[in-house]
């Protein structure tokens, strides 16, 4: 008899909403030269092919910094920089074109065979490159001529869209031509960022050597707003880091987010499957740079009833929460606050005020099992306490049988039944023997 894998079933169920959400959307993927050199690059290419097979429109932008540096070293040619930007003279330009051209051929070949040895073997991936970008020179700064180092002048986004709509993957590198026919060396982060903005991409995705941006303790920061990301860039640059995959992608992500790209993702090129885990799981694996959090704390509406019921049912069955019917929830939905992440209700709580006695009850506190080790409970407590203060209440009480210490650690003190509002005293269940805890607001 074949073994049944419940883990596979659960994983597929969780990923299906993201498959549907991503289908038909445009993603810009930025691959630095470091990622291309890494042993895991073949897996990354295979995963890019898988994304394409799911109906996602893909623009892949590759960089070549380490390959260019290696070419310069081989030819005993010293690289030159001004204000941390490479000066591309004629000799350097030829070596840049050589490195970029080799990478383009290599990546095209790998993408063309990315679905081999998979159930999708035989499916054809059309990879298109072209003069979609027109460049212009950086010019002269402080008397220093950047020569063939350039910037983007314009992008033919309509031509790119035509290729994407025809089912092709668009592959672009760091070299573009000008209206005069000259070639210019661009930065991959500028190319990826401007493409994401002009194409109105849903996402921009970049790879670095770590799993994302980390805090002082070394833990991954799952979400950054542009201002926070800019502060991180400033810190890295002050430490002398101008060219790592992290700082280069963050620069682009900040600009992209402020220009309308909803989410930019930074993940590791060393971790097999990081791209799929980031895109097809609720919490991802790296760092997102977003204008608006994927997680919202808000007052519940009638549309949240199904999510709240799904969240509290297991706790009701365990006797942790008092059972509530759908009808009761519909009548009391205005009392509830929810934490929602990607349309999933992951936490809830309710405030029942007793204004005549200047006290309120915090009830039906529930947090999804996957998020109990984080701060969602504290988030709800802060929101409920703020609502209570706005209503002029002076105290907040809870009735609990299992979370006594959690509430006490947050300032709640034990109390007797006589401390409850009169209406609540009359309804107190002496068989359940819930502990009464009160917080002075």
From Swiss-Prot:
This is Amino-acid acetyltransferase. GO terms for cellular component: cytoplasm. The lineage of its organism: Bacteria, Pseudomonadati, Pseudomonadota, Gammaproteobacteria, Enterobacterales. Residues 295-434 form the N-acetyltransferase domain. Homohexamer. It is an enzyme of class 2 (transferase). Its EC number is 2.3.1.1. Pathway: Amino-acid biosynthesis; L-arginine biosynthesis; N(2)-acetyl-L-ornithine from L-glutamate: step 1/4. Keywords: Acyltransferase, Amino-acid biosynthesis, Arginine biosynthesis, Cytoplasm, Transferase. GO terms for biological process: L-arginine biosynthetic process. It catalyses: L-glutamate + acetyl-CoA = N-acetyl-L-glutamate + CoA + H(+).
